[in-house]
């Protein structure tokens, strides 16, 4: 592949200030890698000789596996960090851990941490030390999860424009995002990427899980609109896409929800509830899924409506694109 001359970001930390052109670069690059993955070779030497280090301070299965596979498909060498068996248990700081992997020759850090801001901190320190190391945020606390936001964007655009996924296909589309907005870094990344792409995003959830701060967000000029609903029906009416989010019980304090059964009664997504959406509506979920809570099992397994497995497939191509763009950006 040739260098993407118009790509200038040294780190991918959030999606708050991305331009539409940058989103399209990622989508175009991911489309190329999707074609590679569907072919016989499945591997390219784009990052041969570079080292990608996965610094996951928080448990992860699908994101870590997806990044590891993406790096290997680009022919990069991969190192994986596990906090339970690391020197963190002996008092080592996060920065010293990063410096240790830096000394081993890391070129790209993929960082997940339960505390918001850690990837930004490591990126700032790598820049201060003039290391040339790139940082990719794989999810930090309740802040953002940019690669998930981009893979969701790619999955959705691939539905509306399968031959050439680009953000223009989302102009004026209505996308409902339903569930635990309060604790969701996925929701935050998605609302930035989708509105920048021109879609109108409708957030829906119980008042305890949909804070008023989202109503006060300032979007870039020309972006789609953002709406908040404490009832499900207005968000679903006329929706082209419905994204449901996991209830993050591990992050919740008491009394945010009466019960999981009551949540499903008011906000669970089912075939019946989708009748008010646009014909051909599709459903996404970033996973892992609580079946029968956020979404019914029947709907989740419906190949005509559910794009959940498509999201997993898109994830590898998008992460290949992001690693490639960071690994080939000119300083």
Curated annotation (Swiss-Prot):
Carbamoyl phosphate binds at residues 62-63, 112, 145, 148, 287-288. GO terms for biological process: 'de novo' pyrimidine nucleobase biosynthetic process; 'de novo' UMP biosynthetic process; amino acid metabolic process. Keywords: Pyrimidine biosynthesis, Transferase. Its EC number is 2.1.3.2. InterPro entries: Asp/Orn_carbamoyltranf_P-bd, Asp/Orn_carbamoylTrfase, Asp/Orn_carbamoylTrfase_sf, Asp_carbamoyltransf, Asp_carbamoyltransf_Asp/Orn-bd. It catalyses: carbamoyl phosphate + L-aspartate = N-carbamoyl-L-aspartate + phosphate + H(+). It comes from the Bacteria. L-aspartate binds at residues 90, 185, 246. GO terms for molecular function: amino acid binding; aspartate carbamoyltransferase activity. It holds the Pfam family OTCace. Gene3D superfamilies: Aspartate/ornithine carbamoyltransferase (3.40.50.1370). Pathway: Pyrimidine metabolism; UMP biosynthesis via de novo pathway; (S)-dihydroorotate from bicarbonate: step 2/3. SUPFAM superfamilies: Aspartate/ornithine carbamoyltransferase. It is an enzyme of class 2 (transferase). Catalyzes the condensation of carbamoyl phosphate and aspartate to form carbamoyl aspartate and inorganic phosphate, the committed step in the de novo pyrimidine nucleotide biosynthesis pathway. Belongs to the aspartate/ornithine carbamoyltransferase superfamily. ATCase family. Heterododecamer (2C3:3R2) of six catalytic PyrB chains organized as two trimers (C3), and six regulatory PyrI chains organized as three dimers (R2). This is Aspartate carbamoyltransferase catalytic subunit. It comes from Synechocystis sp. (strain ATCC 27184 / PCC 6803 / Kazusa).
